[in-house]
Amino acid sequence: MRGMQHTLLRGLVLALALGLVPGVVPAQPIEDELVLITPVSKFIHDAALKAFAQYAKETWNLTVKVNALAAGTPVAYGRIVEWKGRPEVDIFWGGESALFDKLTDQKLLSKLELSKAAWDTIPAAIGKPNPIPLRDPRGYWVGTALEPYGLVYHPRVLKRLGVPDIKTWDDLLDPRLKGNVAQCAPTRSSSSNATYEVILQSLGEEKGWEWLKKLAGNSGIFTARSRDVPSVVAKGEFAAGFAVPSYMAFEERLAGFDIMFVAPKNAYVTPEPMAILAGAKHPKAAAAFIEFLLTERGQRVFMERGLFPITPKYRVEGLPGSDAEKAVEFTGGVRSYFEGDVSNVYDDAIANNRSESLKTKYRAEIEAKWEELKKAR
C-alpha cells in the first residue's frame, strides 16, 4: 500500500511539473518582468537587457518584459533611499561601489544568491597600491564589467598640431594643445569628478590643483555633458579630452570616426557594480540577469562595446573586423585588465569626503577664472 502511495505521489509531482493537471499552472522559473535603475549608458544597458530577454526566451520559452530607468548615480542612489525598501525597480546597476556599501548598511539591498561557480570566477580585487574591489565580501553586490575613465584623442588632429599620440595625463598640458582640449566640468559629470580626484590623489591637493588649472588653460571647451567630449573630438573640433568608452566614445569609433582611447596611469576603473534591491518585485528575474551577465555570452555584450571582462576567464577577441576587434584597436591593443599591472590610487572615502569642496573650489578657481587661466598659458 505504501509503495502504491509513493508511486502515485511521484506521478502527481511529475504531472504538476509538466502542467498536466487541469486548472494547475506550473510555476515559472523566473518572473516575466525586470526593471533596473542605472547610470550605465543606454548603449550598454539596452544591449544587455535585449540579450537577456533573448536568453530567457531560448532557455525557458518565456517572454520577459525588460525596462531601464536611466538616472545619474546620485539621483539613482537617492531614489533607492527614498523608496525605503519598497522599490519601483529590481536592480541598481553602475556607479561607485561605496554607494552600494551604504545601501547595504541601510538594509536596502538583498544578499545575492549566485552560483558558487559564477561568484568564484570574479577576483576579489584588482589594482595596486589601492585595490579596487570587484565583488562585495558581504555578498550584496558584484561587478559586471571593467570600464576605465581615461582620454580620447583624434590622431590626425594631433598630427596636424605636431603632437604625438596621447599616452599620459601630462600630455594634455602640451602648449601645442592650447585651445584644443575638451572636458566636462566635475560639477556636471561624475566621471569628470572621478578623474579630477585621480589627479588630486596622485599629485596631492596643492600640485593637483595647479595641474588642473594648467589643463583649464589648455581647454577650449567645457561641454554640457561628458558624452559630448568624445563627440567633439571625433569630429576633429578638438584634439583630446576626458572620456569613458561607453559614453559615445566607442560609438563614435563604430560610426567610422578617427578616435582613440587611452587609460593613463592611475585612471579610475569602475567594476560597474550590480545589486538586487530589498523588496524587489522580480527577484528571480533579477538574479537570473546577473548570472547571465557573468557568462561568456553576457560578458561578450560588454566586450563588443569597448568594456573589459570582469573575470580573467575571458578576454576581448573576435573575428577580424568584428566589433570586439575594433574595441581592441580603439583601446590601443588592450584585451584584458588581468594581463598587466593596474595602478590605482583612487580612494572612495577621500573622494566622498571631498566631493562638495572639490566642486566649490572648481567653481571658484577654474570656472570663474577660466579666461585668466587661458591667457596665462
Located regions from the model:
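Early extracytoplasmic/lumenal segment of secretory-pathway proteins
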Residues: 28-102, 230
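Short loop->beta-strand "edge-of-pocket" segments that line small-molecule binding or catalytic clefts
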Residues: 35, 170-190, 198-200
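Short helix-initiation/N-cap motifs at beta->coil->alpha
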Residues: 69-78, 98, 170, 216-231, ...
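Pocket-flanking alpha-helical
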Residues: 72-109, 121-135, 247-254
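A structural signal for short loop-to-beta-strand junctions that line the ligand-binding cleft
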Residues: 87-92, 110-152, 170, 180
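Ligand-binding pocket segment of bilobal, Venus flytrap-like solute-binding proteins
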Residues: 197-263
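Mature extracytoplasmic/periplasmic domains
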Residues: 277-344
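Conserved C-terminal helix/tail region of periplasmic/extracytoplasmic solute-binding proteins
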Residues: 336-377
